[in-house]
Amino acid sequence: MRRRRLLLLAPLGVLATWFLVTWATYPSDRTPTGAYLRVTKAVNEDRPEAFFAYIETAAQHACYTIGNYRKKTRSRILEAYPEPDRSRLAASYEDEAGATDGSQVFALYARRRGWLQRLRRDMSGVDQVEISGDRASVQTVKGSRYPFRRRENGIWGLTLFTASLVAEAEKAARDAEIVERAATDYERVRSMEGRAVIEGPR
């Protein structure tokens, strides 16, 4: 009976040992290699939101900015715009406005712009890593290079998407301004029309 129990427990012991060894030898995300491997894992799992923690800070902030502005913009459109513009424009902002946080905004863009597909095609094992201060470059065995920057918390963040996301955040801010001006105009016109109806012809 005891031998049978040992035979049953042996595979679990092997699995536990493998897990502990893997965990102990897996590079920290406070190294460029560790951050790169976590991005690779998330890409292979088709979960771009899972490597949001491994993009640089400016890109993360941009994702939150996009989501916040799109929520505000869509809300103003629904409040003040007349049809058919209200339904059309509200639908165009629906995805970003419906995102619960920056990681979901990032996932939307990663899929929409083909970033995930590109990473899946190009990513492979690490060949070499070059570090210069707070910047690093991870070169893969396929010859692709991935730039990283060390963030304030010590985690390395991929910089590939920063410029695009910052530009999109700036566009979201401009769009919000334009929509707010138009919404105010629509409300003013409705208010004037309402007063005219109440006062009647003179």
Region annotations inferred by a language model:
Residues 1-6:
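Twin-arginine (Tat) signal peptide motif
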Residues 8-77, 177-179, 200-201:
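Short, low-complexity N-terminal intrinsically disordered segments enriched in polar/charged residues
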Residues 31, 100-105, 159, 200:
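Secondary-structure junction/capping motif
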Residues 84, 96, 100, 112-113, ...:
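Short, flexible helical or helix-coil boundary motifs
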